[in-house]
């Protein structure tokens, strides 16, 4: 198992239609907080420069989502719908992996946002808005069988991703990374979430099981991995 797609998929992939536009007369950008006034000014100057090419309406920019990083995402109305704007301070975030993997996914024929504009030195990006509704929002919890079609579509997308794999394109999902990921289970699930303490014999059993999992994964064909 090789090839880490995490830098891209931190942006939430969606199954929904584009959200409705902000009602006229509302200026939601006033509620967005900026730690640095100079970055706020640079952001609005850059966004205003996208009006001619992409029809954005800068006065409608509003918070969309955030992730476990310094990146922030905003939604902005346009003359044809909405777009997503990424704010990624270049001294804290490297957008190059995001851009590279976005191209990989689009080239594979997967449903992913296109990058419409990118100011690499400043860390601003304009993207397609593919919505905010996730698969978890639409699954039927009362009738699991009704979700079969959704899960098959998800599996088809993963197969398409794997079939597009090319060697030496993404960093390898090596033994060290696999071990680090597996270590999250005892540290975060058992200890933090379940409040369980395991003894030395249980830990030894876990370590042996993890080693078996790692070796079997390393022996399998190497393909792109969607870590989320």
Language-model-detected regions and their locations in the chain:
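Conserved catalytic-loop position in the HRD/HxD motif
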Residues: 228
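Aromatic (phenylalanine/tyrosine) cluster motif
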Residues: 8-11
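Short Pro/Gly-enriched beta-strand edge/turn motifs at strand-loop
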Residues: 54-60, 97-98, 208
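Juxta-kinase regulatory segment immediately upstream of eukaryotic protein kinase catalytic domains
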Residues: 16-19, 25-56
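ATP-binding pocket architecture of kinase catalytic cores
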Residues: 64, 74-175, 184, 191-194, ...
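An alpha-helical support segment within catalytic cores of ATP-dependent transferases
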Residues: 43, 50-53, 166-172, 176-177, ...
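ATP-binding glycine-rich phosphate-binding loop
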Residues: 56-74
């Amino acid at each position: 198992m090789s090839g880490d797609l995490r830098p891209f998929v931190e942006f939430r992939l969606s199954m929904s239609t584009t959200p409705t536009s902000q009602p006229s007369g509302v200026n939601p950008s006033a509620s967005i907080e900026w730690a640095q006034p100079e970055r706020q000014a640079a952001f609005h100057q850059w966004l205003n420069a996208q009006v001619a090419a992409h029809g954005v309406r800068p006065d409608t920019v509003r918070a969309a989502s955030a992730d476990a990083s310094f990146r922030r995402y905003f939604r902005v109305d346009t003359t044809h719908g909405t777009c997503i704007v990424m704010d990624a301070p270049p001294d804290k975030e490297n957008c190059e992996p995001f851009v590279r993997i976005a191209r990989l996914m689009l080239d594979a024929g997967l449903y992913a946002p296109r990058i419409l504009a990118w100011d690499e030195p400043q860390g601003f990006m304009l993207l397609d808005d593919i919505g905010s509704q996730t698969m978890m929002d639409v699954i039927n919890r009362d009738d699991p069988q009704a979700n079969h079609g959704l899960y098959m579509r998800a599996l088809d997308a993963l197969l398409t991703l794997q079939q597009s794999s090319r060697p030496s394109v993404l960093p390898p999902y090596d033994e060290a990374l696999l071990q680090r990921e597996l270590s999250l289970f005892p540290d975060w699930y058992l200890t933090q979430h379940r409040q369980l303490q395991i003894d030395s014999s249980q830990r030894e059993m876990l370590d042996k099981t993890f080693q078996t999992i790692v070796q079997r994964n390393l022996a399998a064909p190497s393909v792109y991995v969607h870590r989320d």
